[in-house]
Amino acid sequence: MSVNISTAGKGVDPNTVDTYDSGDDWEIGVGNLIIDLDADLEKDRQKFEMNNSTTTTSSSNSKDCGGPASSGAGATAALADGLKFASVQASAPQGNSHKETSKSKVKRSKTSKDANKSLPSAALYGIPEISSTGKRQEVQGRPGEATGMNSALGQSVSSGGSGNPNSNSTSTSTSAATAGAGSCGKSKEEKPGKSQSSRGAKRDKDAGKSRKDKHDLLQGHQNGSGSQAPSGGHLYGFGAKSNGGGASPFHCGGTGSGSVAAAGEVSKSAPDSGLMGNSMLVKKEEEEEESHRRIKKLKTEKVDPLFTVPAPPPPISSSLTPQILPSYFSPSSSNIAAPVEQLLVRTRSVGVNTCEVGVVTEPECLGPCEPGTSVNLEGIVWHETEEGVLVVNVTWRNKTYVGTLLDCTKHDWAPPRFCESPTSDLEMRGGRGRGKRARSAAAAPGSEASFTESRGLQNKNRGGANGKGRRGSLNASGRRTPPNCAAEDIKASPSSTNKRKNKPPMELDLNSSSEDNKPGKRVRTNSRSTPTTPQGKPETTFLDQGCSSPVLIDCPHPNCNKKYKHINGLRYHQAHAHLDPENKLEFEPDSEDKISDCEEGLSNVALECSEPSTSVSAYDQLKAPASPGAGNPPGTPKGKRELMSNGPGSIIGAKAGKNSGKKKGLNNELNNLPVISNMTAALDSCSAADGSLAAEMPKLEAEGLIDKKNLGDKEKGKKATNCKTDKNLSKLKSARPIAPAPAPTPPQLIAIPTATFTTTTTGTIPGLPSLTTTVVQATPKSPPLKPIQPKPTIMGEPITVNPALVSLKDKKKKEKRKLKDKEGKETGSPKMDAKLGKLEDSKGASKDLPGHFLKDHLNKNEGLANGLSESQESRMASIKAEADKVYTFTDNAPSPSIGSASRLECSTLVNGQAPMAPLHVLTQNGAESSAAKTSSPAYSDISDAADDGGSDSRSEGMRSKASSPSDIISSKDSVVKGHSSTTAQSSQLKESHSPYYHSYDPYYSPSYMHPGQVGAPAAGNSGSTQGMKIKKESEEDAEKKDKAEQLDSKKVDHNSASLQPQHQSVITQRHPALAQSLYYGQYAYGLYMDQKSLMATSPAYRQQYEKYYEDQRLAEQKMAQTGRGDCERKSELPLKELGKEETKQKNMPSATISKAPSTPEPNKNHSKLGPSVPNKTEETGKSQLLSNHQQQLQADSFKAKQMENHQLIKEAVEMKSVMDSMKQTGVDPTSRFKQDPDSRTWHHYVYQPKYLDQQKSEELDREKKLKEDSPRKTPNKESGVPSLPVSLTSIKEEPKEAKHPDSQSMEESKLKNDDRKTPVNWKDSRGTRVAVSSPMSQHQSYIQYLHAYPYPQMYDPSHPAYRAVSPVLMHSYPGAYLSPGFHYPVYGKMSGREETEKVNTSPSVNTKTTTESKALDLLQQHANQYRSKSPAPVEKATAEREREAERERDRHSPFGQRHLHTHHHTHVGMGYPLIPGQYDPFQGLTSAALVASQQVAAQASASGMFPGQRRE
């Protein structure tokens, strides 16, 4: 830029030749230009100095900022700047356009320098006071103000700030200078556009200065047009304002339409695609350069009055300068106006010439070639086979493409054969390549590349992620990066080949081409369609001119004036540009043929609910692709096509046009990433979905773009996410079986992901009959997924591993189907089903893409976890609002509202709080898809876990989710929606079926399971991967955990107290359970994240936590000595017992979870629990992680009471450690657990899993009793030799007492705790009782516990924290199998049972005897009574405990939820306000436990009420 500017300035100033010299410098290479930039600047400076009185200023300004820099120099600089501006304009636009090119780089450097220098000269632009600001302002203002303010500023600055005189003084100066200024501003801001301009400028420079000037004007307009329109307006606006009439016409024409014709075309182009538009603009310009030049000249001459009328402009400059300059630099401007004016006249020519040069040739200047454009490619044959495969290196638009061209006569999947043009080979391989790419992307990657050269550019912006866009995946596509090319092409090739071969080659090719093009083209063309049409039209004309076909076929489209040499070009064009229903009709047959099943379902759903349909479409893309493509990406494009073809397609067609710009940007953004064909499909779907509904995009962007309202914002926000998703997908593309997995092709591994969908969908489909139709995405998937529905079993082959879980799953499925059917019907199947279809589609897509996308998202979310709180809280606030709405109409109405708004929020949550949910989405996806997608890095662990326990985890997670359709749906929804709010919505929608808060279960289980159990049930795969993360994080977090637990306790106390009560107020007022579930879903881990975020963001919280942590650490340390042995022993005991239990309860990984290492490596255990929950004994190592977690989940459901009691005890212990940290005596139990916060937590969880396992099955309980009774009764009673029993006993007793002595024993128990904890661990239980009793202390412990896990272990913490949440969800779910057991039992059930069992096993006579008797009575009593009597429940007889365990199971599996919900409501009111809001589910679970066995539930309730609150 500087060079051009300097050159322009030089040339403009004394000689145009100088400008030419500068132009020559530009001509030199990018490197030379970069090097020459300064030299040229110096030269220009010197020349300016020589030429202008303000040469120095001008030079420095010129140097400083392309043209704008002069403003910084001052009035004298203004003159020089005017010159420079003029020259800069030419050069700046060049710089701008070159910026993107290598030239662009040079110019960018110059521009950057100029921009930096321009900062002063920015004043030129609009802020006289701050050059920099001015320039920035220009840039900033450029979009909207640039034309007006910037043009004024530019003028003022040009005249006043050395550039201002140019702008204002001289029309030419203004035009050129403004162009330069605009260029400068654009240069930075619109590097893409600039680079286009730059290219143009470069070539134009070669062409001539006059062209340069014109081009600058044009470029100004080009850039000005579209995103750059303001710049153009700015450039010309300066001229216009400066020169009033002179620039004004230019401004009007240029800014509004691009300089008259040129600008108009440019503006078309520019609007068409910012960069592309400009690129196309350049191309068009080249094509229309002559006409543009003439127009530009006219305009230039119109502007020339600016430029040409040096005399008037100086006056104008003076007048304008006073007008504008007074604002900015009127004096300087006026003074230098005349000289600058004259110089500017020269500059004018220079500027025009510079810009025009690079217009045609710069590929970047020309957007991606429009489909149907005829191109002649020159290439070198790399390889040709006898089979009709030609590999060529083609240079197109200065880009080299490697393409594999297929002989369409020999390859059915080759590009359409209907191409008859002289360039038919290229067309076939290139233009047809689109169709071919769809068909033989893999077969002809190179072909597509060469084709992409011709079409790839088009594809680039067209959302290379389209069937034809898949071409975008061509290497040439660039946006569709080679990875996509490879993955897409390869995948597309099989699918394409299969489909294409299966279908009539011509029809298939045509349809596929059209259809493939359809999604991509529609997105692409729609994004560029309107502009592209004009653009493509000249472009087409230009290209067509190049083509030899004498007769051009006019596009029949009413608004399309494009002409094509062959029908093929027209078809390609139509496929991409006119993918609306008419074109869809054209391609619909193929789409129907390919995806008729999915399409039918999709159309139904899509037609049924445009949003769900879009979601379905997106989902179908994921799903249908597999269906048509047998899980191959081609199938995905077909899904897209289907999507396009289907009602969603129509919707998308219409909306895609609208959103095409948006989507185009998104697609471009996404396409820039190596986007997988599937992702591309998803993106296209998203584009379509974006157009048709945010749903599809949400689907793809899942939570991010879910809301239409937020679609734009989230699209932007999620663009990054999607980019990540794209990257993930590109990564996963290889592993992308997931995407195909959604496809109903069971044969492939994808079938497993399909199974994932199936498990979800199966649950959804079976669970939601109406949803099945509505969730046509599931339905498209459903036809295949119905085959795959068994796949839930496949997915859940591990499910099979756990027959109990399977049975639970079946029970829950049945139950939830009933409930879902009920509620689906109640909710209004169409609306809810549509919503669910959308949600599930989103979920399916989210599940597929999210598996990766969410994985990335998860990583992102992990990052977000810390920074999440702000956005989360804001989103949560919106979610709360949404929850108010939703919860007002709990299950039915909320589904749409939540589905859209909440889902949006969910998507936001996905980004924000839902990160965990996406994690879990990933988890679910990963868990389910890990089998299919085991190869993916993220799922590598999961695959192990999935294979060993990961599959189990998945199956269990799936079981937990897929066991009940409601659960599955909720999982799906949870995955889709977030996994919190989303889960809530989904649950409302899907779980709403369950009269009880099934939706809440999904909230908890999906969200908690997702976040915490990312490594647990659904996290089986993702969980493994994330389990690994969790392992790492849990190890890290475990370390943090101590801090986090303690800090989190405080934080949670505060956050829970503040946030949850707020949320609670919103939600609790609604359905307490729903509120809880929503908040749990949203806040369960969201709170953790909030805590974490608060920790990260809130120094106060950190201080509080650290303080709390220190207090607890002291207690912990003390207790660590006394309690560590106990803890270790406890861990060992659970390990031993659980090891046995593990063997016995392989179904219940909790046995594994409660291994001795849990104490030493609580983090590890946590990780293991989280990730390997599914891994049972198979992957005891892993399984222990996952299995432990899952076992905990399962054991939780079985041992919800024990867990609750245990949790209460643990919380009581923690509270003790918090409270007893002051009372060092009673800190022992807490220290035991707290000493190693992780160990302690793990002990609780280990105990939980252990006790879950123990109480998972009565056998385990009995065995544990035998084991524990002998070891515990004797040693653990008071000697606490088996520290485990003692600890457990004490824990049990503590929660009992905590529950029991809610108020009475509080002080006593505290004292007792102090006394007992140290002396007798199990006696400490009573002491813990006190600690637990103290609501705040308990709450703190609860929060701490909850928070500690969630905080460091957003994933892993899911065991306790998520258990806390999920149990309600899962409990309410008939299949609390994983989540309920996992979640609830950890706190209520496990605690209660553990207490009972521990008390019984290690018959601490005091507690056990009394409480045992009480246990039966008290356990039978309700929550309030439970609290006071929780010790009794803790101590209930072993038989009672076993009975309770059975009840617990029954209760957990079928209708613990019912009572749970009732109780949940009760507890919600009570426990929810506190952290229990998060653990309220435990209370709910406790309620569930109460339902099954109120005794256990009583314990759980008591512990669940307050301990539940404190429980973490």
Curated annotation (Swiss-Prot):
The modification Phosphothreonine is found at T481. One of its GO terms (biological process) is negative regulation of transcription by RNA polymerase II. GO terms for molecular function: zinc ion binding. Residues 220-230, 449-458, 526-535, 925-934, 979-989, 1055-1066, 1146-1157 have a biased composition (Polar residues). The modification Phosphoserine is found at S421, S424, S493, S627, S782, S895, S964, S1098. The gene is ZNF608. Residues 278-304 form a coiled coil. Residues 1-23, 46-74, 89-237, 260-295, 417-545, 622-665, 713-750, 777-858, 925-996, 1011-1066, 1117-1192, 1220-1335, 1423-1459 are annotated as: Disordered. This is Zinc finger protein 608. It comes from the Eukaryota.
